[in-house]
């Protein structure tokens, strides 16, 4: 469905309620509710939804379009900083290494780095800004320090991800064109990369802890999945968006339970950001219900 300017505000405010009521009436279990939510978002937004949900203790999983390609958008900032941490583990850099922030580096959405122009930021500060506040300039500086987008793609391959690839920097990596494989991942591939970085042995325990620290604050994700989670749960997440997309990747650690990995991608839709954002909230709500069960 294409949304006109006259109905967008109504859709944005009513979508979450409509989807929640529909899933509550049609679905009997949280998994069925999740499936219904995905189907209704695809229908109402004219979108593709890719989702992978995995319980790492038992290996139980549920997915939809798990092998299809979706733009990573800002979710790529997690593996970018994973690559920084891998080099830290190897002794090739220090997180206290400082890089300059130049006026020429500025691109749209730089809430942290725009206040540091003319100065330096450490790699630690840049990764926190890139992940927690989704600062695009911080991400570009980090990508450049690694050797460019191709170095990030090589890092994906080194952790066993044959699918994900980075071809451009911010903001061009968000440009959507149907069928374009640049700057894409799949829900399944990103789930495995998150597992490798945060739960596997790709990084040292110290590096895994640092990545978790950068991801735990929810600077730009507070109203998404983590808003539905229990207070005692640990949520490590990163969101992303473009003109036709809205994404979230997360590790969910329930109190006393095994970690879950959730990757959610909404794409190929002309709906405005507010509509896509409400749809992502609905996906997060449905995922949390499955985890809580």
Curated annotation (Swiss-Prot):
The keyword Zinc-finger is assigned to this record: no
Pfam families membership: Beta-lactamase2 (PF13354)
Signal peptide: 1-27
Subcellular location: Periplasm
Record-listed substrate binding positions: 238-240
Any one GO molecular function term: beta-lactamase activity
Keyword Ribonucleoprotein: no
Domain of life: Bacteria
One GO biological process term: response to antibiotic
Catalytically driven reaction(s): a beta-lactam + H2O = a substituted beta-amino acid
Leading EC class: hydrolase
The enzyme's E.C. designation: 3.5.2.6
Catalytic residues of the enzyme: 74 (acyl-ester intermediate)
GO CC term, one of those recorded: periplasmic space
Keyword terms: Antibiotic resistance, Hydrolase, Periplasm, Signal
Cross-referenced PANTHER family: BETA-LACTAMASE (PTHR35333), BETA-LACTAMASE-TYPE TRANSPEPTIDASE FOLD CONTAINING PROTEIN (PTHR35333:SF3)
Function of the protein: Hydrolyzes beta-lactams antibiotics. Rates of hydrolysis relative to benzylpenicillin =100: ampicillin = 27, carbenicillin = 25, cloxacillin = 0, cephaloridine = 4.
Further facts: The class A beta-lactamase family has a specific amino-acid numbering system, sometimes called Ambler or ABL numbering and often misspelt as Amber. A multiple sequence alignment was used to derive a consensus sequence and then the consensus was numbered taking into account insertions and deletions. This allows use of identical numbers, e.g. for active site residues, despite differences in protein length. UniProt always uses natural numbering of residues, hence there appear to be differences in numbering between this entry and some papers.
Family classification: Belongs to the class-A beta-lactamase family.
Protein name: Beta-lactamase
């Amino acid at each position: 469905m294409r949304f006109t300017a006259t109905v967008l505000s109504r859709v944005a405010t009513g979508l979450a309620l409509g989807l929640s009521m529909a899933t509550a009436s049609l679905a009997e279990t949280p998994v069925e509710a999740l499936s219904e939510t995905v189907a209704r978002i695809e229908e109402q937004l004219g979108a593709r939804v890719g989702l992978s949900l995995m319980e790492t203790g038992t290996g139980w999983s549920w997915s939809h379009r798990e092998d299809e390609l979706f733009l990573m958008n800002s979710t790529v900032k997690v593996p970018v900083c994973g690559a920084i941490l891998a080099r830290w583990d190897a002794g090739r850099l220090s997180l206290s290494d400082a890089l300059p922030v130049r006026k020429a580096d500025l691109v749209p959405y730089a809430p942290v780095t725009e206040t540091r122009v003319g100065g330096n930021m450490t790699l630690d500060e840049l990764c926190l800004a890139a992940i927690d506040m989704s600062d695009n300039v911080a991400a570009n500086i980090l990508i450049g320090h690694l050797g460019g987008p191709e170095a990030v793609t090589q890092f994906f391959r080194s952790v066993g991800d044959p699918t994900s690839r980075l071809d451009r920097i911010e903001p061009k990596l968000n440009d959507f064109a149907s069928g374009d494989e640049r700057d894409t991942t799949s829900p399944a591939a990103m789930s495995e990369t998150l597992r490798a970085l945060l739960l596997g042995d790709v990084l040292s325990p110290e590096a895994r802890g640092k990545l978790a620290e950068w991801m735990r604050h929810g600077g730009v994700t507070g109203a998404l999945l983590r808003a539905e989670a229990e207070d005692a749960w640990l949520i490590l997440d990163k969101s992303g968006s473009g003109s036709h997309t809205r994404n979230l990747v997360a590790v969910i650690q329930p109190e006393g339970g095994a970690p879950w990995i959730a990757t959610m991608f909404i794409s190929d839709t002309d709906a405005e950001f507010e509509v896509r954002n409400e749809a992502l909230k609905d996906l997060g709500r449905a995922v949390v219900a499955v985890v809580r069960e």
